[in-house]
Amino acid sequence: VGSEMCIRDSGTVVITVGGGGIPVVCRDGKLYGTPAVIDKDFASAKLAELLDADMLVILTAVEKVAINFGKPDQKGLDTLTPDEARKYIDEKQFAPGSMLPKVQAAMSFAESKPGRVALITLLEKAAEGIEGKTGTRVQM
């Protein structure tokens, strides 16, 4: 986290925590592959928290988080509180391995400190989302 903080403090936007890699464990001085996944969304939320960021931006394939996704009554969400997100999670509104981890990571970040905001949106709409013009903002 130290090098990321130096870069951040220089005024540079930090893009990190990509996918990939092979998880291993060390036994008897040897490395062995192990079934594990480091989720990019959760890792990004944790890094943003450790960097004391005000905003976490999670980029995805849709402009907004939606309920009833893919159905005639689909509704894009402009804002989402962690409590609302939990309700929708209980209703199974978000696909596991797709939107669910993004929403959970956004909730975790938003709840980690007052005033924090997580934005979920398209790469092409990131600037507009940061300006508050689009995307889904998750905050307390």
Which residue ranges define each predicted feature?
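Active-site rim beta-loop-alpha module in soluble metabolic enzymes
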Residues: 8-28, 62-79
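Alpha-helical scaffold segments in soluble metabolic enzymes
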Residues: 10, 46-50, 64, 104-112
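Flexible, glycine/proline-enriched loop segments at strand-loop-helix junctions
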Residues: 3, 31-37, 90-96
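Conserved mixed alpha/beta catalytic, RNA-binding, or beta-rich assembly cores of soluble enzyme
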Residues: 13-55, 59
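Short, small-residue-biased leader/transition segments that mark boundaries at the very start
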Residues: 1-7
